[in-house]
Amino acid sequence: MGCRMEFSLCVKDLHNFIDKVNYMHSRYTSRFITKTRSVARQSFQYIQGKLLEKGKGNMCSYAKNVPDCDNQSLQHFISDSPWDHWPVLDDIQQDVTRFIGDKKYGAIHVDESCFPKQGRDSVGVKRQHCGRLGKVANCQVGVFLGYNNGPYRTLIDERLYLPEDWIDDKKRRKKCGIPDDVVFKTKVEMAWEMILHAKDNSVPFGWIGIDCFYGRDSWLRNQIDREDMTYIADVPCNIGIWLERPRTGIPPRKEGVRGRNPTREKVIEGTDPIKVRDLKDQLDDGQWNHVFIRDTERRELWSNIATVRVYPSCVDGLPGEECWLIIRQDDNTDQVKYQLSNAPLGTSLRCFAMMSGSRYWIERAFEDGKGIAGLADYQTRSWTGWHHHMTMTILAMLYIMLITIDMGKKAEFLTVQDVKEIFEVIMPKSNITNEEILHLILKKHKRRLSARWSHHRRNK
């Protein structure tokens, strides 16, 4: 490893940032023209507001930061304007396919994000498990689909989970503008719907990464397997598995017991399933391999990985199809991760490491969405407003990612946060000059390179 880096950004490149955003958004403007008017201008102003906001934002602060913009027009654009968000999301998927799509190394990821809310008037709000807070709380739950190819990541689809009591509440449905054709769907069903839509939209991917809540659901794993798609699913440490497939069948009626003959298939011969955490302790040293996962900002991440063929216990207590169990423990941590995958028999450890490590990038995508694009910063309570806000957030994330990729050719350690900070300076009139922001970005690059180099020398 040499102490060198690529950095050839100049002031002219900074001026091109705004031109690039203008060009990218011009390709979406037709999606913001309704039967009665065009809201393309407001759509770009909303994007600008997100790019300019330095903290938690809202439409009032967006209107203050964006020239010739007012709060009411943005409020109407998000909450009331009838533009259709579905075609925008489809276009986003096409752009993701065009710029970072790869049928071998690309991956789509299923995960959710919770948004704590006060009161009971925001669409879909309910006291339910809130992952963000780690407890039951009053919140909305969004189910999302993300995409990554290596470190390049973004969200590409969304759904709002509506609890069953919302579906049956005509008064609240009407107040929040929930369409009549919206019926109850579980979060897992929403995830499957998004996966199929991405596939139908020709989004290329080599595998599907699945969060633990969704990964433990045998129905979803089976659906993916039947469609000949590959998954790697996080699962809890107490999920049951068999190393040998037990014999199943319909047991005979017990002698002397009245009633109907049994009709449900059950495990009739074999041991009880064991928990995956118990299997970990039974593995010998020869079953573990030390494998590179990915680069981090300071060092390379390596893990001890074991792969075992197992039969997972399904929701009905029967064994599922044989698949891989991946047990992974990263260096310098006590945390152990468990994953199931239907990858082919000949799958290499390197491939498993890449698939397993890719789950990290969907977590980063949510951090990007909340930290630089205002994913959780909204006050709208309506069905339309929620979907409009999420769609515009995903669009802003796409723009930032694409500019990071483009400018990264001249600054190899450029991050999405760097790009966001550049926008905060060059879009409004600022006291800091372009030369000064360029110098700040260069200093960040040098710090990142120095951190990597120092860690490399310590671990030689």
PLM region spans:
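An anionic, glycine-rich sequence signature occurring as long contiguous blocks
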Residues: 151-180, 236, 241-361, 424, ...
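Short, solvent-exposed helix-loop connector elements
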Residues: 32-33, 341, 347-356, 371-387, ...
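Generic structural signal for hydrophobic core residues of well-folded globular domains
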Residues: 50-54, 66, 78-81, 343, ...
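Conserved, well-structured functional cores that handle cations and Mg-NTP chemistry
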Residues: 2-209, 213-240, 247, 254-277, ...
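Conserved nucleotidyltransferase catalytic core and NTase-mimicking acidic/glycine-rich helix/loop elements
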Residues: 401-429
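Short acidic (Asp/Glu) and glycine-rich catalytic loops that position anionic groups and cofactors
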Residues: 55, 70, 331-336, 343-348, ...
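Hydrophobic, well-ordered secondary-structure elements that form the walls
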Residues: 363, 395
